[in-house]
């Protein structure tokens, strides 16, 4: 038996990283349009639109993006749409690509199992990726997975008995006695697999102004900062970009009281009693942290938005206790009726109505 030790390897919270980057972008002027479905992308002529006739051919080419919330016009598009990247690429380019959703299922174990391994343990990579791994998380849980199953369904992020069984079997070959009785949830995600096994990054030859970031699967998260710089460099060459003297390069994170000393924590509660009102008992998340998550740049508007910013609902009971209390806070702070709140945006509403009203309606029938 032999292993390859990588002392510089590390782990990061993917939710926290993405939210931090997005909040920093928002502070620096980036606009976000959530729950907005792209329906069509068409090439257009900016010269015709603006009445200008002195532009080069590349400068004349632009895009009209029709969405569920209106029409947008853009001179450049960066296509970082994951499993849907092929759909948008193929709307504008004659050189078609295909992205296959590759499903990966996982087990997440309770923090009581978090020290079962101290490093990420990878199996030998194969045709479908790096295989089933066993890894600690930055918050002290144990993560086991993923599988690799190619699908036709670009929304197929469901778990299966076969997939979870595969995790049980393969993970035990690398790490013995994994306490799978401590599993608190299982989930699945989709990786954007390009049929040529390539990251497709760059401006399309036949569509100036359209920049692909397609087929970004493992190690996509690790590669993301470098990919971002690469794409920024492409845009810098094509646009007259100037450094913003008011750019804010740092972002203040959500206060984590668990990192404070007892004296500092007590002083925090004295100044703001909301930090002493525990909402999530599994993860010990206070009302103060939830309020911070709601009212910061690009603040949370859903139950999952709170969970991914604060970990309220990520513990052993998986929101069984705290979700009603979190929803009450969201409803109060956003001035939105409880019936309109969602789990993760879109149509994922959590409440259908008041039970007494439903029963009265049935009696009337």
Language-model features: where?
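Helical element adjacent to the flavin cofactor pocket in flavoenzyme catalytic cores
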Residues: 5-44, 61-75
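C-terminal catalytic lobe of FAD-dependent flavoproteins
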Residues: 129, 138-139, 155-278, 285-298, ...
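Dinucleotide-binding Rossmann-like beta1-alpha1 core, especially the glycine-rich loop
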Residues: 1, 5, 131-132
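Flavin-dependent oxidoreductases
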Residues: 41-43, 66-145, 149-160, 169, ...
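Short Fe-S-cluster ligation motifs
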Residues: 307-323, 340-362
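Intrinsically disordered, low-complexity terminal tails and inter-domain linkers enriched
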Residues: 44-62
